[in-house]
Amino acid sequence: MDQEKVIVIDFGGQYNQLVARRVRECNVYCEIYSYKTDLAQIKAMNPKGIILTGGPNSCYEDGAPTCTKELFELGVPVLGLCYGAQLMQHVLGGKVEKAPVREYGKTETFVDKSSALFSDVSEKTIVWMSHFDYISQIAPGFKIVAHTADCPVAAAECTEKNLYAIQFHPEVLHTQEGTKMLHNFVRGVCGCAGTWKMDAFVENTIKEIREKVGSGKVLLALSGGVDSSVAAGLLSRAIGKQLTCVFVDHGLLRKDEGDEVESVFGPEGQFDLNFIRVNAQERYYSKLAGVTEPEAKRKIIGEEFIRVFEEEAKKIGAVDFLAQGTIYPDVVESGLGGESAVIKSHHNVGGLPDFVDFKEIIEPLRNLFKDEVRKAGLELGIPEHLVFRQPFPGPGLGIRIIGEVTADKVRIVQDADFIYRSEVDKAVAEYKKANGKAPAWMPNQYFAALTNMRSVGVMGDERTYDYAVALRAVNTIDFMTAESAEIPFEVLQTVMSRIINEVRGVNRVFYDLTSKPPGTIEFE
């Protein structure tokens, strides 16, 4: 992609993808590379700026990730963050040692507003520290431009060479004015114009697809999820009916989801493509009969998808390209294990190439983060209910039904889940209308699951012996940890009443308060 870019060099820190996302929020394109990437390759990319990330090591120890002095002599602005700041000082002649006082968490920091990084930042600001080493002596040519009560060098700069070292993490939200600092570096120091915008990305990607595909045929497995839907939209805009999408409806989707996907991508939809819907519900239910173990269910669902897709692919015949909804985090995670100096091409194919007759993979979203994929979807005109769809597991409702999966159990969980999500969405919308903002309790993910427990109840003066539905709602930033959402009790009461009255086969509703850990977000 021929455009101005900033390169993030990864040293193993936990926030590295976040750094790249923050740079892109400044409308500047950014890519992540391993610290092992050859200097000549970095130079050949002609970056407008370089950012060195944090990492878990001590830069003065043998075997620690490092870089050459020549990196700082390219004539390109360099910003070091945490470990990256320490490494910059260490390589250029400063001194880094174990800190007499470690700093973790929110820390009051005093900055020199004459610095280009802090010109519009408050003189006293809150930043996020996370370090056990510190810069005890700055390198020649540097000037200290920020400090804390326990850290004499919270930031240093060498304006002559446009080198900047920051001991804290401006990329995390806990650093109150971190976005300003990164903006000042990327747009100010580096001089980036800020031309990375989604409308331009969509337009350029469509051109690139047309050039690459030519008159060739493309095959895409369309799940109805965000990534494959946006990939389908991009490809359709570029090559029309040269694209064939195979949508396998395994009967384990949310209520009406299969029809929603077809309404957008099918013959009556807004996209010009060949759409094949395979209704394989009974086939899946038959394979899952009597199976109760979660991993066994996952395996059956995955293997059956392969078989169904294989059958359809054989009917279609040879194609030139197999398209995938690979996104940038997949690419980054495949290439930063230390085995490759450059991020490797990531083929998230899951066994498909063995039986699909194709020449090459095409991944139109491989440069985008998840939030950018959603923006691209909106730019393409894909309906919001698809673009902002909640996370949904690959095995679908198969792992939201505890125990054996049957058609009747699928009906129960589909109906209960639809009611639950509808009522939560309604409550959120009403709050937004009244208050002009989303409620603090608004969950990041919420769904209903069917337990394997039946119990006695009384409905209409008659004894019942029916299933219990569990409601799950969590608040989370990264889905690695999560807390149960505090949905208002009156909303939960309405949900409970509707489920018991409207969903045949249910006489109890539970609300799951378990955090992650010890629990997981999904039930199986």
Curated annotation (Swiss-Prot):
Q: Which InterPro entries match?
A: Class_I_gatase-like, GATASE, GMP_synth_C, GMP_synth_GATase, GMP_synthase, GMPS_ATP_PPase_dom, NAD/GMP_synthase, Rossmann-like_a/b/a_fold
CDD domains, per the entry: GATase1_GMP_Synthase (cd01742), GMP_synthase_C (cd01997)
Q: Which residues form the active site?
A: C82 (nucleophile), H169, E171
Residue span, Glutamine amidotransferase type-1 domain: 5-195
Q: Which catalysed reactions does the entry list for this protein?
A: XMP + L-glutamine + ATP + H2O = GMP + L-glutamate + AMP + diphosphate + 2 H(+)
Coiled-coil residue spans = none
**Pathway noted in the entry:** Purine metabolism; GMP biosynthesis; GMP from XMP (L-Gln route): step 1/1
* The organism's place on the tree of life at top rank: Bacteria
The GMPS ATP-PPase domain, residue ranges: 196-389
**Its EC number(s):** 6.3.5.2
Give the CC-aspect GO terms.
cytosol
Classification via Gene3D superfamilies:
3.30.300.10, 3.40.50.880, HUPs
Positions of ATP binding: S223, G224, G225, V226, D227, S228, S229
* Keywords of this entry: ATP-binding, Glutamine amidotransferase, GMP biosynthesis, Ligase, Nucleotide-binding, Purine biosynthesis
One GO MF term attached to the UniProt entry: ATP binding
Subunit structure, interactors included: Homodimer.
| Function, as annotated | Catalyzes the synthesis of GMP from XMP.
Q: What is this protein called?
A: GMP synthase [glutamine-hydrolyzing]
Q: What phylogenetic lineage does the species belong to?
A: Bacteria, Bacillati, Bacillota, Clostridia, Lachnospirales
Q: Which gene encodes it?
A: guaA
